[in-house]
Amino acid sequence: MTDESSVRTPKALPDGVSQATVGVRGGMLRSGFEETAEAMYLTSGYVYGSAAVAEKSFAGELDHYVYSRYGNPTVSVFEERLRLIEGAPAAFATASGMAAVFTSLGALLGAGDRLVAARSLFGSCFVVCSEILPRWGVQTVFVDGDDLSQWERALSVPTQAVFFETPSNPMQSLVDIAAVTELAHAAGAKVVLDNVFATPLLQQGFPLGVDVVVYSGTKHIDGQGRVLGGAILGDREYIDGPVQKLMRHTGPAMSAFNAWVLLKGLETLAIRVQHSNASAQRIAEFLNGHPSVRWVRYPYLPSHPQYDLAKRQMSGGGTVVTFALDCPEDVAKQRAFEVLDKMRLIDISNNLGDAKSLVTHPATTTHRAMGPEGRAAIGLGDGVVRISVGLEDTDDLIADIDRALS
């Protein structure tokens, strides 16, 4: 029997391999048993050969795991694989996507600091920026993310951090990543990009100058709606410094089990995103000509107001389609509920990036916490519907949507 005490470092991947290949093979470590699948290290703590080794491990003088809230071998493999896919210097896994968002900003901001954020955000991200960070003494200034002149005005004074989603959830508004990053850096700010809608397969922020990228691993990375998880990617100094300190002492750590599940998700991420992206494009085109639909927001539709920007900074429109029903606003909620309830294949759920196609009414679910004024400011009315396109046959999905709209 092979000695299981040793860890085998895998052969280095050849230069120039694709993200799909990295997703399957990147960062893998094998124990002495030479298993084909990554090992799942379900342990809370670790033992030391001597008290001196324990002391040096806690002092950071030895490369030794000390406690799974600080680090775990399975979690480390997940971090390394995602880092390689993204092309980032370093990565840190978190318990959820919102833990990643909060930690990434908390590691940059303190009392008296200034944050400039796009107004069109996921509901919980909006609450973090508008309510929670201000309790720490952080000033948050919101701008319309698709209006570069507003970014210019907001970043004309010293600022510590910038935060945005692009495409935004659910309105699919885009931020010109390169232009805003240039403005932010001139103002002294670090740029945090929430890349959950695009995934690293369709958009990469680091080549465009961003400092930090965050993900909800719960979405496309898992891809089957099984576990929660998140990740923060940035330079080594940022990850090993303020991010690690905040994570270590506040505790939103990823579990080894969740990391193992997410590793399985990374293996199929490229092929899933490719299929769902192509399917979403067809569904968006179908909805764009439907008589019951007022407008469709999908970055790779020529009718999208920022279509040219989408083509520049994305390699696909993504897996999410947002549309508004063509009906009076006073009956829009009722009409939207009727449409959702009539779908027979597509499930009503607030998640996205799943193998199963999912539909939600953002105003009463994911963005309820924004309140009526916050939703109105980003154009999110009661007739807006968001579909996360999964892996089912595209024709079957279109038939289901058409039936629900009839």
UniProtKB/Swiss-Prot annotation:
Q: In which pathway does it act?
A: Amino-acid biosynthesis; L-methionine biosynthesis via de novo pathway; L-homocysteine from O-succinyl-L-homoserine: step 1/1
| This protein's record includes keyword Nucleus | no
Q: Which keywords, in A-to-Z order, does the entry hold?
A: Amino-acid biosynthesis, Methionine biosynthesis, Pyridoxal phosphate, Transferase
Q: What is its EC number?
A: 2.5.1.-
Residues with the modification N6-(pyridoxal phosphate)lysine, per the entry, are K219
**Reactions the enzyme catalyzes:** O-succinyl-L-homoserine + hydrogen sulfide = L-homocysteine + succinate
**What InterPro entries does the record tag this protein with?**
Cys/Met-Metab_PyrdxlP-dep_enz (IPR000277), O-succ-hSer_sulfhydrylase (IPR006234), PyrdxlP-dep_Trfase (IPR015424), PyrdxlP-dep_Trfase_major (IPR015421), PyrdxlP-dep_Trfase_small (IPR015422)
Please tell me which top-level EC class this enzyme sits in. Answer: transferase
| Family matches, as Gene3D superfamilies | Aspartate Aminotransferase, domain 1, Type I PLP-dependent aspartate aminotransferase-like (Major domain)
> GO CC annotations?
cytoplasm
Instruction: Give cofactor(s), names only.
Output: pyridoxal 5'-phosphate
NCBIfam families linked:
O_suc_HS_sulf, PRK07810.1
Record-stated family: Belongs to the trans-sulfuration enzymes family. MetZ subfamily.
Q: What is this protein's name? A: O-succinylhomoserine sulfhydrylase
- Name its species: Mycobacterium tuberculosis (strain ATCC 25618 / H37Rv)
